[in-house]
Amino acid sequence: MIPNWAEERHSMVATQLAGRGIFDCRVLRALSEIPREQFVPLDVRIQAYADAPLGIGFGQTISQPYMTALMAERLCLDGSETVLEVGAGCGYAAAVLAMLAARVVAIELIPALADLARENLRRTGRGENVQVIAGDGCLGWEELAPYGAISVAAAAPEIPAALVRQLGDPGRLVMPVGGDGDQELRLVTKLDGHIDTSVATHCRFVPLRGGQKRR
């Protein structure tokens, strides 16, 4: 039997998000409207709204809904920003950010996943203000910097200097930092030339990879 996806989304928002401290109404609305099931592979579609990350191929994952919501909420977007997303994956988080910001620049290292993200965004009607670029997210995307916010969906031992440099002032960046077994979701805030860093939560993400030319 085909699930009632609208009910699945409503339940996910109520229990996994609002029930765990996500209070930003715009973030909750975005995740209640975007059809997550249309962004995941067919073989895991039945689990689209599970409280867990799901494989999307090439050793990559789509984050659990709570983590997508938490990262978006911590960016405190007001709708005027250009957001840089590193690790576009299947395009789902970019779709969420696109409902919260003026423009999203989403970088994906794996060309086939960049193509998938573009197609998913096009097919679901969520790509009008999203530009997907196949390239090395560790380098950011200098051409459109500075960014009002940066979201990184892969972990590294430290935050790449290029991303901090491309973060606007004021600006906020969220990224998991650490190794395979111990990662922290860090929030970097830049204001009046000062940079502050805090820890939002512990987490577990795939590693941030680099070394591929942009296209």
What are these regions (language model features)?
Residues M1-L84, Y92-A95, L100, L113-T124, ...:
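Class I SAM-dependent transferase core
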Residues C76-D196:
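Conserved nucleotide-cofactor-binding alpha/beta core module
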